[in-house]
Design a protein with these regions (language model features):
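Residues at the C-terminal ends
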Residues: 35, 63-64
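Alpha-helical residues within the helix-turn-helix
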Residues: 45, 56, 62-63
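Local alpha-helix boundary/kink/capping signal
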Residues: 58-59, 98
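Amphipathic alpha-helical dimerization/coiled-coil segments
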Residues: 1-9, 13, 86-117
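N-terminal helix-turn-helix DNA-binding core of bacterial DNA-binding proteins
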Residues: 8-53, 72-85
């Protein structure tokens, strides 16, 4: 993505960062890694997906400098690069919860309205 009129490098950087987060499995990987480093094998066991899938998602996160890899003997261990990512995920969870509560309220109102007809 290149900057265009009205959009600077910082906005492009932010968009690329959030694009790297825009995958359900990558989000789940990060939710695990904010609690401590893990190997691909450990992530695979927790997530219930195959090793190539986990490795592919970690590669995307590494390319955007969201996670770091550290070799420990023959095992590579992954960790979030910035602990503040846990705060970002927590804020997002609160926003989503409020959105879902609003959606549930709207659905209840629609059901009540449907019953009156």
């Amino acid at each position: 993505m290149k900057p265009s009129p009205g959009i600077g490098q910082l906005q492009v950087f932010k968009a690329e960062f959030f694009k790297a987060l825009a995958h359900p499995l990558r989000i789940r990987v990060l939710e695990i890694l904010v609690n401590g480093e893990r190997s691909v094998h450990e992530l695979q066991a927790i997530l219930g997906v195959d090793q190539p899938t986990v490795s592919q998602q970690l590669a995307v996160l590494r390319a955007k400098n969201i996670v770091d890899a550290r070799k420990e003997g023959t095992v590579v261990r992954y960790a979030v690069r910035d602990a503040a990512l846990g705060d970002l995920l927590a804020v997002a969870r609160r926003i989503f919860n409020r959105h879902l509560i609003g959606t549930q309220t709207m659905l209840r109102e629609l059901r009540r309205e449907s019953r009156r007809r």
